[in-house]
Amino acid sequence: IQSILKARLKDQTKILIAGCGTGYELEYLFEQFPTASFVAFDPSEQMIRNAQRRFQHKKDSSRIKFIVGDTSSLTAYKNQFDVALAILVSHFLVATEKKRYFKEIFNSVNDPGFLISYDLMKFQNPVQIQQLQHLTQSLGLSEKQSEAMVERLDDDFHLITIDDMQQLLRNSGFHRTEYFTQISNFYGIISEQ
């Protein structure tokens, strides 16, 4: 993601983090793009507090505005952002929420801005689920944790196919979508205005 952003963004860029969680990627991007300004939102007040803690002692933390809320918070930011990042968020949203999420992000991104999304997509066969288990274990989950994750897939995730995701993004207004990476069933997609 960093290489995509470095190649496409200018100084003084405005970046939206659409679902910032604990602020992990926000902290990384804050360091990599020292002249950028950020708006980071999450519907969880606890997650926003966790993210804010990462920046308590950082110089220039005023470059970040934190918002407790969902994409409806973006109505005040029409055409404001050069890029939006939606990392590991939409796979938790039901279909109607996914549509609203991406449409509101589209409305907040300027032209020629773009969206980078990265999410888990629908499995086509049982082997892909096994691959996901092995991947998550190689990234630090225990066998028991990865089994619990697989058992919760149907309850916690609302997965769609990569083709359906690209169509959803186009229906939201983005003109061109292409995926730039795939790891197991996690796809990174660039969607352009």
Language-model regions, residue ranges each:
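Core SAM-dependent methyltransferase catalytic element
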Residues: 172-193
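C-terminal alpha-helical "lid/dimerization" subdomain adjacent to the S-adenosyl-L-methionine
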Residues: 118-172, 178
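A short glycine-rich, Lys/Arg-flanked "PGG" loop and its adjoining helix->strand segment in the class I
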Residues: 99-111
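A conserved beta-strand element that flanks and buttresses the S-adenosyl-L-methionine
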Residues: 85
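Short catalytic micro-motifs in class I SAM-dependent methyltransferases
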Residues: 88-91
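Conserved alpha-helix/loop element of class I SAM-dependent methyltransferases that forms part
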Residues: 1-11
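Short glycine-centered segments of the SAM/dcSAM-binding site in methyltransferase folds
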Residues: 14, 112-114
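Class I SAM-dependent methyltransferase SAM/SAH-binding core
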Residues: 16-17, 22-73
